[in-house]
Amino acid sequence: MHVIPYCHQRGDKIMAYNYQGYWKDVGTLSAYWEANMELIDIIPEFNLYEEFWRIYTKTDVIPPQYFSADSKVNACIVGDGTEVYGEISNSVIGAGVVIEEGAVVTNSIIMNNTVIKKGAKIEKSIIAESVEAVSY
């Protein structure tokens, strides 16, 4: 259930603010996936690199991304500390992720500290934080 209808049903006080900026309801997995894929559009509605959209967070000090000479990357956002040896395309990749040689990630969201093992094929998926995705 979405937050506002839930609060209304409980009888909670609901107030409004006429916000003019970017907002997207990501209350379902499909909406969350779509919002992330929109970030890698050629001209995204919400451009993370525009100066007025700056988001300041506490970050860990980790090395930059590493892309092996044999890796293939197309239209992705890749977090710091990520190592790419395989192929990634049209995906949002968190920090500290390892994409092993022979692994292929397409149209997906991979959360922090996850390992995509050799030979794994990930397509249109959301992979949780700190897990291993294996080929079978």
Could you say what each language-model-derived stretch is?
Residues M1-Y136:
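Left-handed beta-helix
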